[in-house]
């Protein structure tokens, strides 16, 4: 039996989320296949160390028909995926076309088909039995530690060119420039409307550089155009699980908490002592961010 893992990369390095998915696939004692759009044979050939037996290389994750053919022709019944926006969209398409059920916010998969999932914005867990012979699992990050393996990987390049008769057309592609991937960052500095405007974001950028962190924002900030949409974390944005999450000037609505509540440590800075975020915080500072953040920067040198 084979398991397919969707592979994402961060600056030529396989993401930690994809490495963890490969570890889970090996724990299920299945043959582990990977799917990637990164055509770099030198690097891909090293992915045996991450637990992959075979890698399928396609031009683009938007070439759905080619991906569906890979799944059908190889008898793949189990798909493990990081919970990124790209793979959520891809998984929804595959689910519809191939009649695969989807389990989201997955915390644990057992060999007997039992699945544990995070529900109610991380406040509870649901336990289910999958009696179907196929399933797509959208995995929460950091549910296992990724492991190294001694495997040699086979590389298969798939002809996924769109035919001339296809209605599919790529109009534009934009590269998101990030110093550190938000999905894989150990430390995330996030800010909200408490910063009062985009002109005050420099101190957030400065703190992120000092701590080798990624930057993020709340939905209202993204909606207002203060920060790019790909930095939005929350129920309708990215769901992240860093080791440390700073929430600066964010009230802590349940929709935002849904995207960050699996962070190992949450530090809140807010001038409102009644801000809901303090209830979810491991550490909290009541005060003006415009006074506190510069003091933190000064203490870091």
Language-model regions, residue ranges each:
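N-terminal glycine-rich FAD/FM-binding segment characteristic of electron-transfer flavoproteins
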Residues: 1-301
């Amino acid at each position: 039996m084979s398991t397919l893992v969707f592979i994402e990369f961060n600056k030529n390095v396989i993401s930690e989320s994809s490495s963890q998915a490969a570890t889970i696939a090996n724990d299920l004692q299945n043959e582990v296949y990977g799917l990637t759009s990164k055509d770099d044979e030198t690097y891909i050939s090293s992915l045996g160390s991450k637990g992959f037996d075979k890698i399928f290389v396609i031009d683009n994750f938007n070439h759905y028909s080619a991906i569906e053919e890979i799944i059908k022709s190889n008898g793949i019944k189990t798909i493990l995926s990081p919970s990124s926006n790209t793979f959520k969209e891809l998984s929804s398409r595959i689910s519809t076309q191939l009649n695969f059920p989807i389990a989201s916010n997955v915390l644990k998969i057992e060999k007997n088909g039992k699945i544990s999932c995070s529900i109610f914005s991380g406040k509870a867990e649901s336990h289910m039995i999958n009696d179907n012979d196929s399933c797509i699992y959208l995995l929460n990050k950091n549910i296992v530690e990724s492991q190294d393996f001694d495997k040699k990987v086979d590389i298969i390049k798939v002809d996924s060119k769109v035919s001339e008769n296809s209605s599919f057309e790529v109009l534009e592609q934009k590269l998101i420039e990030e110093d550190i991937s938000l999905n894989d960052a150990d430390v995330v500095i996030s800010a909200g409307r408490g910063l009062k405007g985009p002109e005050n974001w420099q101190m957030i950028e400065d703190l992120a550089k000092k701590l080798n962190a990624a930057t993020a924002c709340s939905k209202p900030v993204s909606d207002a155009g203060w920060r790019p949409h790909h930095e939005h974390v929350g129920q309708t944005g990215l769901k992240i699980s860093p080791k440390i999450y700073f929430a600066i000037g964010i009230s802590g609505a349940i929709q935002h908490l849904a995207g960050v509540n699996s962070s190992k440590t949450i530090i809140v800075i807010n001038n409102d002592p009644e801000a809901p975020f303090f209830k979810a915080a491991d550490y909290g500072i009541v005060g003006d961010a415009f006074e506190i953040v510069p003091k933190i920067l000064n203490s870091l040198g």
